[in-house]
Amino acid sequence: MELCSQASFSDAHECTSIPIIAANVQRMIKPSQSQIWAVLRAKDDVHRTYYSLISGFLGRLCISGEIFDLPEENWQIALDSIKFYDEIKHIIKNGFTSVIECNVEDYNDPEGYQIVLRQTENEAILIVHTFKNGANPPIEKHLENWKVQKE
């Protein structure tokens, strides 16, 4: 990665293991150099739209798919997510990943949760993905000493 500025993190752009792979790749490629593709489909519900976009927060958010055919609500979610990404991209670029906590055992049928904390000296972004049977992960310990700005 010293010879190029960016690389696509994986070919797994539409599977449920996107955030798991993207977090693992952070151990070898800086998130600022890792393109994470959010593939948006017109048939996706709002939960899937959020899931795909927030996965992109684990690196350089890239968007593809049927963006011109998205329902209005999903398009607004995409616009809001891009705006929020713009507010936190300096943490992705200049920060360090201090926590990758994932209790998933099967990438093809993930159950559980994943928590990723990326921080600078004064700011942090906590990215949480839940999978089947993964509701209410233990995030409180990762929020200690931080003031929550947005949820």
Model-found features: residue ranges?
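Solvent-exposed, flexible loop/coil residues
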Residues: 5-7, 67, 103-106, 117
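Short, low-complexity, polar/charged sequence segments that are solvent-exposed and flexible
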Residues: 4-8, 75, 144-148
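Carbohydrate-binding surface patches
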Residues: 105-148
